[in-house]
Regions:
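Conserved donor-binding/catalytic core segment of Leloir-type glycosyltransferases
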Residues: 243-260, 266-270, 419
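Nucleotide-activated donor-binding/catalytic signature segment of Leloir-type glycosyltransferases, i.e.
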Residues: 282, 287-289, 294-320
């Protein structure tokens, strides 16, 4: 049986790609070999990733077999090359123009399931031959988004019915919170739902990252969905002690799109600044990553223009160091529909930094559950001014006394090593 424990991972995000999409499988893959699984990783060679982070290539273990194939990316012809603000199509540089709306409509109606649709056919042909040359591969794992990769998996499964196929959903498909922003017409919407249902019903196993997300996928596919959350790697954080920021820093890492605007926080910070000159002098909001232009407008309206710092892009290693030095980590869930099941990789990375997390989102969500389980900070509903103010003032008092700490618990269950063991056990059950 041992010589049969080889899997093929089909992924779009792989180093030197940076950003949120790469970390789930980069981390899990590190521990597959110790659980008895060899992994072949199929990824694009010349992709138009919105973020490049060459440092991540150092985290790729030598026991992986990496296969790269060129990909046609329509984004390069739409003026989006290497612009981190188009990640997910949610953050904007300025007010939407007719051209921008046309680009979004094109994406939502012509590129189905997504802009990587042109990689499906050549990948299927290439991997069909590759599987013939590597009969030891018994299992395929497709991870999306982009969900075009699930279509590749579905085609390979149809071609080789005996092979096992696991569809790994890092985000929902048609239930993703920005789906309607893509302006899908009736034909496109029907096509998306048909593809989604087909993949969900034909895969041997469906895996996703949270309970609410699993519930949504289960309803669509009419089947059980396994939950294996994102996680983090302990070694990246178990380094020498880092000096904390001298300012009372509230740091947000990653994309802050318009639906993630933490308006209640700006209200609270603005009011306290007006009442307390010491607080105003100490406060610094660090925004690291793509930020929608409306966020800056709101900061100015709340007279916080001198209390924030914007850094467009840092490497993953730099972000880890900055997280560990921050006084407070800010995590905001999109204020849109279907957000209860979104438990992002950012949350787990914040856990590893072991600094207090201020999470703003929807009540009874998977994020609130995880916050309560780990006791890593404070979860606050979107419009809860009183609790937000109380927590900020409490943390500021502790900051002034050099006693602001995070005493989180139950972290082992979210380590990439533990999650990889769980994933490999699932793969074992398919053999």
């Amino acid at each position: 049986m041992e010589d049969k424990k080889t899997a093929l991972l089909i992924t779009y995000y792989w180093p030197p790609a940076g950003g949120a999409g790469v970390h789930r499988w980069l981390r899990l893959s590190n521990y597959f070999i110790e659980n008895g699984w060899k992994l072949h990783v199929y990824c694009p060679e010349n992709a138009e990733w919105p973020i490049i982070d060459n440092e991540l290539q150092k985290q790729v273990t030598s026991d992986l077999t990496i296969i790269r194939k060129s990909i046609f990316e329509p984004h390069k012809y739409l003026g989006k090359k290497n612009n981190p603000n188009v990640s997910g199509g949610l953050t904007r540089n300025s007010k939407s123009s007719i051209i921008q709306k046309l680009i979004i409509w094109t994406r939502g109606n012509l590129f189905i399931p997504d802009a990587r649709v042109f990689w499906i056919r050549p990948s299927f042909r290439f991997l069909k031959k590759y599987l013939n040359e590597h009969p030891e591969i018994t299992t395929i794992i497709s991870t999306g988004p982009p969900h075009s990769l699930h279509v590749i998996g579905q085609k390979l499964k149809k071609e080789r019915p005996k092979i096992k196929w696991v569809a790994d959903f890092r985000d929902p498909w048609t239930d993703i919170d920005f789906y309607q922003e893509l302006l899908p017409g009736k034909w496109a919407d029907k096509r998306q739902h048909n593809l989604e249902k087909k993949c969900l019903q034909e895969a041997d196993e469906i895996v996703t990252i949270s309970d609410n997300c699993a519930e949504g996928l289960s309803k669509i596919g009419q089947r059980k969905v396994e939950v294996i959350t994102n996680g983090y790697n302990f070694p990246y954080f178990d380094e020498e002690k880092i000096d904390l920021d001298s300012k009372f820093t509230i740091a947000h890492f990653g994309s802050m799109s318009f639906p993630r605007n933490p308006e209640i926080l700006w209200n609270v910070l603005s009011d306290i600044c007006k009442e307390n000159s010491s607080f105003k002098n100490d406060l610094l909001v660090n925004l690291i990553g793509p930020v929608d232009f409306t966020i800056f407008e709101r900061l100015i309206i709340h007279q916080l223009e001198r209390n924030y710092k914007y850094i467009a892009l840092v490497t993953h290693q730099e972000s880890i160091q900055m997280q560990r030095a921050s006084q407070i980590m800010l995590l905001v869930a999109n204020r849109t529909g279907n957000v209860k099941g979104i438990l992002t990789g950012k949350f787990f990375e914040y856990l590893g930094a072991k600094r207090p997390i201020l999470a703003i989102g929807e009540a009874d969500s998977d994020l609130e559950t995880a916050m309560n389980l780990t006791q890593c900070g404070k979860f606050i509903s979107y419009d809860d001014y009183s609790t937000t103010r109380t927590e900020i003032l409490k943390w500021y008092d502790l900051f002034q006394e050099n006693k602001l700490e995070c005493n989180s618990i139950n972290l082992d269950m979210y380590s990439s090593q533990s999650l990889a063991k769980k994933y490999c056990a699932l793969l074992d059950s398919l053999l």
